[in-house]
Structures are given as C-alpha cells and as structure tokens.
UniProtKB/Swiss-Prot annotation:
Catalyzed reactions: phosphate(out) + ATP + H2O = ADP + 2 phosphate(in) + H(+)
InterPro entries: AAA+_ATPase, ABC_transporter-like_ATP-bd, ABC_transporter-like_CS, P-loop_NTPase, PstB-like
Membrane topology: Peripheral membrane protein
Protein role: Part of the ABC transporter complex PstSACB involved in phosphate import. Responsible for energy coupling to the transport system.
Name under which the protein is recorded: Phosphate import ATP-binding protein PstB
PROSITE patterns xref list: ABC_TRANSPORTER_1 (PS00211), ABC_TRANSPORTER_2 (PS50893), PSTB (PS51238)
EC number(s) per entry: 7.3.2.1
Keyword flag ATP-binding: yes
Localisation per UniProt entry: Cell inner membrane
List of residues binding ATP: G75, A76, S77, G78, C79, G80, K81, S82
CDD domains named among the record's database cross-references: ABC_PstB_phosphate_transporter
Amino acid sequence: MSDTTKPPMARKMGLTAERVHGERRVEDPSRSVMTPPKEELRANVKDLSFWYGEFQALHAVNLPIARNKVTALIGASGCGKSTLLRCFNRMHDLYPGNRYGGEIDLQPEGQNIIAPGIDPILIRLRIGMVFQKPNPFPKTIYENVASGLRIRGIRSRAVLDERVEVSLRQAALWDEVKDRLHQSAYGLSGGQQQRLCIARTLAPNPEIILFDEPTSALDPIATAKIEDLFTDLRDDYTIVIVTHNMQQAARISDYLAFMHLGKMIEFGPTDECFVKPKHAMTEEYITGRFG
C-alpha cells in the first residue's frame, strides 16, 4: 500500500499498513482494552454509569487519570466523552433527574466526588473547566481572573494582583493585556478570550483542569497558542481534554481514551494507541474507516 492509498490519519500519523493491520486486534465491542498508566494517579474512574433521566449515557466506564499528564478523550459525536468529562466537576448536578453510578475517586485521599453529601461547589474549586466557546464574564479582564479567588474568600489586593498576573502569564496572555487589565474582556479577540478563560480557571489553583474542545471555535493561529500551553501546564496540573481533532490529540496528549456509545473501548499511552491500537474499533476510528 502506497502512502497515497493509506487512510488520511494513517498518513498523518506516519502509520504503515503493517503496523496498523499486522496484528490481531480485539474485535468484541463489549470488551475494553486498558493499559494502565505507570505514573501516580490523580483520579480514578471506577464503573461509572450516568443517566439523563431514563436514558443511560455512560455504561460502567473505567478510566485512570495520571498525575501531571494530559489525557485525551476521543470518539464519534454522541459517544459520551463530554458527558464523562462533565461528571468530574459535577456539572450534571445543575439539571434535575440526572444521576450517577459508580465512583470517581480523587487521589491520593480516595474521596469519591460523586458520592451523596459531597458539595459540588467545593469539587469545582478543585476541578476547573474550560468550555468549547470562550465565555468571559461581562467584567474587566482583571475581574474575570480575580472572580474565582474572591469566591474563595481572598480579599487582599496584593494577593489578588499577584494571582491575576501569574495566571495571565501561565495562559500566555499577560504581555497582551497588562496595559488594559481594567477594560472589558469583550474587547479581546476570540483566541484571547479563550486564554482569559484558561487564566480564570487557573487562578484558584485547581488540581485538575477539564477542557471540552477548547479550540474548536478558534482559528489555527489561536489554536496553536493554546496547544502550546499544554506542555507548560502539565508541570503543575493534571489535564483531561475532549477533542474531535486526531492530530491535536496526538500532539498534546500523553494518554488516549477512545469511547463508543457510552463505553470505554480502549485506553493507553497515546503513541501506542495511534501506532499499535489493541482494539479493532480504535484502529478503524483513528484511520478514518470508522462507521
């Protein structure tokens, strides 16, 4: 098979026909293939199920999240990856009738964050989230970043100033906005607004950051700037990202989780999943032959 006849993703990832098709794969869609991380875990999803009312969206999902690594969730639309992501910070609690089963344990303490009696507000301070479209508050740039700190009870102007600057620097935005901190956030470009939302998420110093397709509404230049952040952010944070972009998943993630119809199909190191997937459905998806 020549390069021009390989599936587009196989060409993009440099996969050869022998490496993609040369070994027997697991074909049973009811079976998942897991290659656990060698690193210490920051969170551990155990037999997680989730229902929107009577509809079951997740089926006994297991997913280990390695500390200070980027884990990418991939799969076709409707596979449950965004549903899974929003379980981590209890976003589903905002709508009546939704319910969980199983566990999401934060490590090392082993606290099940979806257990009854756990305050979701406290969970969201520990697990931040950046959404698909930039959603700055109708406030100044400064107040967008400081808002989460004020919720935590921080009132010292010196502390607020320091955390705002540090967070904007972490989001690679400080040099672009340092002279207009007290102007409206709506005056920023789309890419700048998304980096502002990242800074806002970083300010309270969360343990885990969730990204739900954070670059899907941005142009390639803005996308590249945000992707560049992941290398630095993983030094201090554990990251879980949902993406439809296979190239992006390959560029930025350490671990890959492929989902289908609310089930975990395969999880393992990103390079292994792309170069040598162990499940036939994973191979079909990443080589563009899925469905």
